[in-house]
A protein has these predicted regions:
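Charged, solvent-exposed interaction patches on well-folded alpha/beta domains
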Residues: 1-99
Length: 99
């Protein structure tokens, strides 16, 4: 195929590669990755589908926070137990549980 010209598309491809190599459980559960009108990354999980809002900057750092959050809830809940996870704020997860 042709070479992706958009910086954000290239950034998305690099991010997906890094997730595949370093956070495989998340990679296996990604249904889609998109950018909203504010150029914020959004990941939708296969399960349920949970929406994860990552924002525009420090995406990998936010994914590391998400991975720690996932480890914390392991055995009690899964990421898919939440309707959405908002990672736009540094070092915190804003979570809305499914009803």
């Amino acid at each position: 195929g042709g070479k992706a010209r958009s910086v954000k598309v290239q950034e998305s491809i690099q991010l997906l590669k890094k997730i595949k190599n370093e956070y495989e459980t998340l990679y296996q559960n990604i249904s889609e990755m998109s950018l909203n009108t504010n150029d914020e990354f959004i990941i939708v999980l296969v399960d349920q589908p949970t929406k994860i809002r990552l924002g525009r900057t420090n995406i990998w750092a936010k994914l590391l926070v998400l991975r720690e959050f996932e480890k914390t809830i392991l055995g009690q809940k899964r990421l898919s137990d939440y309707a959405y996870l908002d990672m736009r704020y540094n070092n915190q997860v804003i979570a809305k549980e499914r009803l």
